[in-house]
């Protein structure tokens, strides 16, 4: 009985050790791949509560982003590195937010993502997705996921200003395409 117990303990110990080594190796591979990325371009699906929106998006590290939504409001989201602007062209209206108080401050800051991956363990390591979780000083809870096979950035999950779950899924990702900084310029309302 004691021999079986010792054997069981040894098997469990080596299994846990193997999982930790495997996770560390996976994290190193994700970090290596992400370090090479300068820009991302992709289609997306964004689900907020029960509402789903689609569009295309461009990210240039650090902190630049432009997403064009395919909807009746002709919504565009732009981060110029300091400010996030939600533009509703149909209504000729722009809403401004300081980037530092939004989850985009982490998502668009590659160094923050690299540190998150380096210094934390995945909260989920499934068949298709590897997920890391980040909590910041503003109480933003952010889950970032990567494809387990390609190790590419697959999206994120967070909460919006109204505490609705936001799931942002990346589709057809392309990396390191040339994107000019002026593409991320926020227009003036009178120019809409």
Model regions: which residues?
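Bacterial N-terminal signal peptides that target proteins for export
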Residues: 1-9
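Solvent-exposed strand-loop boundary residues in beta-sheet-rich modules
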Residues: 48-50, 90-92, 162
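A short, Trp-centered hydrophobic/proline-enriched beta-strand micro-motif
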Residues: 32-52
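An acidic-aromatic
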Residues: 57-106, 166
């Amino acid at each position: 009985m004691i021999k079986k117990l010792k054997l069981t303990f040894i098997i469990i110990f080596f299994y846990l050790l193997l999982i930790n080594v495997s996770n560390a190796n996976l994290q190193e591979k994700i970090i290596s791949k992400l370090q090479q990325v300068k820009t991302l371009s992709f289609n997306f699906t964004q689900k907020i509560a029960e509402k789903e929106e689609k569009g295309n998006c461009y990210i240039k590290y650090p902190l630049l982003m432009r997403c064009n939504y395919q909807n009746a409001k002709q919504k565009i989201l732009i981060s110029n590195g300091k400010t996030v602007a939600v533009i509703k062209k149909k209504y000729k209206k722009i809403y401004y937010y300081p980037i530092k108080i939004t989850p985009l401050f982490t998502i668009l800051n590659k160094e923050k993502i690299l540190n998150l991956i380096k210094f934390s363990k995945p909260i989920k390591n499934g068949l298709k997705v590897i997920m890391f979780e980040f909590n910041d000083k503003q109480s933003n809870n952010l889950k970032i996921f990567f494809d387990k096979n390609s190790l590419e950035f697959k999206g994120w999950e967070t909460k919006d200003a109204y505490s609705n779950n936001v799931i942002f899924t990346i589709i057809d990702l392309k990396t390191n395409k040339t994107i000019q900084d002026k593409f991320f310029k926020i227009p003036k309302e009178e120019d809409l």
